[in-house]
Amino acid sequence: MKKTAIAITVALAGFATVAQAAPKDNTWYTGAKLGWSQYHDTGFIDNNGPTHENQLGAGAFGGYQVNPYVGFEMGYDWLGRMPYKGSVENGAYKAQGVQLTAKLGYPITDDLDVYTRLGGMVWRADTKAHNNVTGESEKNHDTGVSPVFAGGVEWAITPEIATRLEYQWTNNIGDAHTIGTRPDNGLLSLGVSYRFGQGEAAPVVAPAPAPAPEVQTKHFTLKSDVLFNFNKATLKPEGQAALDQLYSQLSNLDPKDGSVVVLGYTDRIGSDAYNQGLSERRAQSVVDYLISKGIPADKISARGMGESNPVTGNTCDNVKQRAALIDCLAPDRRVEIEVKGIKDVVTQPQA
């Protein structure tokens, strides 16, 4: 048992440098181990010679990590072949088994984990003996189940690759009456494991902020002669048809999120006061009609501009006849509509 205590001390001494954090939750791992296998309390019957209790041990294992603290492992262990000699009999003993254990761990740091395993091993033990007196040889084997206890530390080399330093103890491997011995075994091993599904999750990319809405301003000019009879402010049928066409264009600009200003203009025939009033009435007629079509009343306004800002300039100064002057000044008689609307900017998703 003194050797067992030494082995446990060596295992714990590796704590500071050989360890790993537990795998991610609900992932699988597999690995292999190699180390020093030592048999204890061998007590061979009719054996009074040397027994080679220290052997090479090895194994393979696989496991499922439930969470950082709990996992389950299943593995195969080769515990080594132990020769012995005596004055009457020489022989060898070997043992191997399949174990199933619960693995209880505790993370010390992001890369360091200390753990214990508790469970059982289904083993097979074989002996081969040669009688030095009679020259006869015999082979025997035994099977059974024994408890398994293990403790160790793990260290993450990479997210997928891990190492472990472990000491494992298995009780009573064999029946002395069947195979001549009933030893215990301590296995100090260094293992390497590969853990599946440890890749970093794809980073969550924050969606790009929605582009600021684009404000568009458009100007429309309608001839008053199309909208109204001369010197009148009541819309003609053809004027309503013209505004119907205009409304479809305004809808595309979404005036509900913008504003509409209707500007009425007259020519220079008549007094300034009269022309100002006529331009206001004409602008209001257009506003009323567009409101009836669906433009919100709080988003549209009328403004009379009178005879200001003539577009004909001085081209009609020499026209004296009234009918001809009315025709010449027709471009000045107009309704201008200024629309400021919100246009949604649609961005294409990146591939």
From Swiss-Prot:
Organism in which the protein naturally occurs: Shigella dysenteriae
Short name of one Pfam family: OmpA
InterPro entries in the record: Bact_OuterMem_StrucFunc, OMP/PagP_b-brl, OMP_bac, OmpA, OmpA-like, OMPA-like_CS, OmpA-like_sf, OmpA-like_TM_dom
Protein family: Belongs to the outer membrane OOP (TC 1.B.6) superfamily. OmpA family.
TM ranges: 27-37, 55-66, 70-78, 96-107, 112-120, 147-156, 161-168, 187-195
Record's protein name: Outer membrane protein A
Region (4 X 2 AA tandem repeats of A-P): 206-213
Residues at the site labelled Part of salt bridge gating mechanism: E73, R164
Cystines in this chain: C316-C328
BP-aspect Gene Ontology terms: monoatomic ion transmembrane transport
This protein's record includes keyword Signal: yes
Principal location: membrane
Annotated OmpA-like domain residues: 215-343
NCBIfam families: PRK10808.1
Record remark: domains: The extracellular loops are most variable in sequence, and in some bacteria confer sensitivity to phage and/or colicins.
HAMAP family, A to Z: OmpA
Topology of the protein relative to the lipid bilayer: Multi-pass membrane protein
Endpoints of the signal sequence: 1-21
One Gene Ontology term, aspect cellular component: cell outer membrane
Sequence-type repeats, residues: 206-207, 208-209, 210-211, 212-213
Subcellular location: Cell outer membrane
CDD domains reported in the protein's UniProt record: OmpA_C-like
